[in-house]
Amino acid sequence: MLIFPLINDTSRKIIHIDMDAFFASVEERDNPSLKGKPVIIGSDPRKTGGRGVVSTCNYEARKFGVHSAMSSKEAYERCPQAIFISGNYQKYRQVGMEVRDIFKKYTDLVEPMSIDEAYLDVTENKMGIKSAVKLAKMIQYDIWNDVHLTCSAGISYNKFLAKLASDFEKPKGLTLILPDQAQDFLKPLPIEKFHGVGKRSVEKLHALGVYTGEDLLSLSEISLIDMFGRFGYDLYRKARGINASPVKPDRVRKSIGSEKTYGKLLYNEADIKAEISKNVQRVVASLEKNKKVGKTIVLKVRYADFETLTKRMTLEEYTQDFQIIDQVAKAIFDTLEESVFGIRLLGVTVTTLENEHEAIYLDF
């Protein structure tokens, strides 16, 4: 018996656009000499005493096992010939807005998930074109022609499947999952590839002998809800390719943060980083409590002279993992110029939030 009715609307046409290695691709576009070389966006460990973290990297660097949130030191060890670029996030945001303007030519139902990806509902669209595949190809062409960057497109009847489709073939991919193809696509898929299924849920499912979509399909809704609570309801539907979540235009992103003002100024690096970790602990606790994950980490520092600095780093993957957020926040601190003034305030904030079980986890 189903606790919640199965409603599977297969009439929608949803496109998920994911820019290919976005930050690194922008750098390659603006500096053609980088093409064909491994490029890492992050602090160069040779200039920071081994400190720093990878924000993202291009596909050449990924061949060496480099990935987002890896320490810059490990990335260098894996790929010593890589070119490290600190990143220009203002430029990336501007390019991201240019891409978003292209989306708006086709539909107003655009839901940005981050600076480099978005869902588009093209069931009804400004072009009056019925084929979502044709629209996706037109969008890819416009992005290449206007912004000189490539993207991958996933097309299906809901957001869950459209995202899986865009991940299926990268870069420059275009994958369509029709309603009668969903089960064949999902059955062999490793459970960790189901976006919205985090590391702890994967471990719990593996312990139950669930490794693929087909394994998940064999479990009843009641048993999944018993084991996972409300998330069991979502898992039951994911296994069947069901997702009723609408495309929400320009959804406002909130943030979760923690900051503290110190009566006694902080000067010692070890003390400062210990306080950063305390802020991160509070942020992670709040993320877990609110079942949120995020992909942009912001560090705020206020000195004794009241100069306030705010710097951020955006990762490719959503996270609520303490170690990743802590490592990134400290890596941001390492990029700040030393000040003769002590620190009176430290803050850590995670933005670009998504519900834990709707978030995207990498990798018609």
UniProtKB/Swiss-Prot annotation:
A GO molecular function held by the record: magnesium ion binding
UniProt catalytic activity: DNA(n) + a 2'-deoxyribonucleoside 5'-triphosphate = DNA(n+1) + diphosphate
The protein's Enzyme Commission number: 2.7.7.7
GO BP field: DNA-templated DNA replication; error-prone translesion synthesis; SOS response
DNA-binding as UniProt keyword: yes
The protein's required cofactors: Mg(2+)
Record-listed Mg(2+) binding positions: D18, D116
GO annotations of cellular component type: cytosol
Top EC category: transferase
Active site (UniProt): E117
Nucleotidyltransferase found in the keyword field: yes
NCBIfam families per UniProt: PRK02406.1 (NF002677), PRK14133.1 (NF010731)
Function statement: Poorly processive, error-prone DNA polymerase involved in untargeted mutagenesis. Copies undamaged DNA at stalled replication forks, which arise in vivo from mismatched or misaligned primer ends. These misaligned primers can be extended by PolIV. Exhibits no 3'-5' exonuclease (proofreading) activity. May be involved in translesional synthesis, in conjunction with the beta clamp from PolIII.
Protein name: DNA polymerase IV
